[in-house]
Amino acid sequence: RHRLGDDTRRWVPKHKKPLRDFFRHDLPWQTMQPIWKKEFVKQLGGFDEGFARHQDVELHTRALMLPSVRVEQFPGPIDCYYRVGEERRSDGIARRSEKLVDATLHYYERFMPDADRLGMRSALVGTLHRIQLQLLYHGREEQISRAELTQLEKRLFPKEIWRSIPLWKRFLFRVSR
């Protein structure tokens, strides 16, 4: 958007299970909203710069998996704003979507063992669906071509991942189209 506060979307932290929500890519907060102690972030090893995107999501996910982490949320009036710089938009929707798919797969593969261990595989599969919906939106808005959409979906759901998703969820992914 163009002016401070002209976007109606809000990040109001009121999630009961933030780890599950991060796995589903239903992000409970934006990078600048949590307050972590410096020692805690150092203990985590900081951001994983191996992630081209989702570095913040990856950091918060690792933090929330620690049994000792304590999270409190304080919904209230807006106290911060953020914007996406135009330089991040210069690639075009198709290229940004490719990067998003790659980062999503990196996140999915990185956290699948943890999601399995915690009984949250289904939530992590939700992150794929969330990204698929974004791709479908770009396709419907004709921001990407039908061919680009098809390629991006194939990239998002390689055969080994597609086969690991329960049949009923695969059905839902197809119905979403």
Regions found by a protein language model. Name each.
Residues 44-47, 114-118, 134:
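Alpha-helix C-capping/helix-to-loop hinge sites
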Residues 70, 114, 118-121, 163:
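Generic macromolecular interface patches on structured domains
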Residues 76-86, 91-119, 141-158:
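Catalytic core of nucleotide-sugar-dependent glycosyltransferases
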